[in-house]
């Protein structure tokens, strides 16, 4: 921001100090003018000389001029002060506006962060639930696979036992057939021998 003409970088504090100092000077000048007027009145009453009167009158004019100059300077400084105060007010409002905008943006960011954090926590919880469900399903699947393996072993053992049983049955059947054949041959042989004896006995008679 550009510095106004006659305005120092000291800020509004230095302007207020200069303003107070000028006010003190004006009060001193007014007091001096009052004293000079009293002196002129006293001199008039005491019939002062014309030279002294002109000298006092000259000083009074000079003091009035200085007083007017000081008042003009004071008015100028007051104008600078009001300008500075106006700038301070504008800057304060702008700063407050920027502060409110920043706080609003910060609040929005915090809200988004909390929402994202909440979503993240929900996703983590969901993933953990899915992972836990998968582990349970894997455990169930492993249990089923073990049951299937056990059943396969039982079936395989039963098949083997059945095959062994069939083999034993065939062997037994073969043995029974063989024994039947042997017995049949023995019966036939015995029958033939009995018939032969019977015929021989008939001949002898």
Swiss-Prot record:
Residues 185-205 are annotated as: Disordered. It is found in: Cytoplasm; Nucleus, Nucleolus; Nucleus, Nucleoplasm. GO terms for cellular component: cytoplasm; cytosol; male germ cell nucleus; nucleolus; nucleoplasm. GO terms for biological process: cell differentiation; spermatogenesis. The keyword Transmembrane does not apply. It comes from the Eukaryota. Signal peptide: none annotated. Residues 138-185 are annotated as: Required for interaction with CBX5 and TBPL1. Residues 17-167 form a coiled coil. Residues 186-205 have a biased composition (Basic residues). Keywords: Coiled coil, Cytoplasm, Developmental protein, Differentiation, DNA-binding, Nucleus, Spermatogenesis, Transcription, Transcription regulation. GO terms for molecular function: DNA binding; identical protein binding. Binds DNA with high affinity but does not bind to TATA boxes. Synergises with GMNN and TBP in activation of TATA box-containing promoters and with GMNN and TBPL1 in activation of the NF1 TATA-less promoter. May play a role in cytoplasm movement and removal during spermiogenesis. Homodimer. Interacts with CBX3, CBX5, GMNN, GTF2B, TBPL1 and the polycomb proteins PHCF2, RNF2 and SCMH1 but not with CBX1 or PCGF2. Belongs to the SPATA24 family. This is Spermatogenesis-associated protein 24. It comes from Mus musculus (Mouse). The lineage of its organism: Eukaryota, Metazoa, Chordata, Craniata, Vertebrata.
């Amino acid at each position: 921001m550009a510095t106004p003409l006659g305005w120092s970088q000291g800020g509004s504090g230095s302007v207020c100090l200069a303003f107070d100092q000028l006010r003190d000077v004006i009060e001193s000048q007014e007091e001096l003018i009052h004293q000079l007027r009293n002196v002129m009145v006293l001199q008039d009453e005491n019939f002062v000389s014309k030279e002294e009167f002109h000298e006092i009158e000259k000083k009074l004019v000079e003091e009035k001029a200085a007083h007017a100059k000081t008042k003009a300077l004071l008015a100028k400084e007051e104008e600078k002060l009001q300008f500075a105060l106006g700038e301070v007010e504008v800057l304060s409002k702008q700063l407050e506006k920027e502060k409110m905008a920043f706080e609003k943006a910060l609040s929005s960011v915090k809200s988004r962060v909390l929402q994202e954090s909440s979503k993240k926590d929900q996703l983590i919880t969901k993933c953990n639930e899915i992972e836990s469900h998968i582990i349970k399903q894997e455990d169930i699947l492993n249990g089923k696979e073990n049951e299937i393996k056990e059943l396969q072993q039982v079936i395989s053992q039963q098949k083997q036992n059945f095959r062994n049983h069939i083999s034993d049955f065939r062997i037994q059947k073969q043995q029974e057939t063989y024994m039947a054949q042997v017995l049949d041959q023995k019966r036939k042989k015995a029958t033939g021998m009995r018939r032969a004896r019977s015929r021989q006995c008939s001949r002898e008679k």
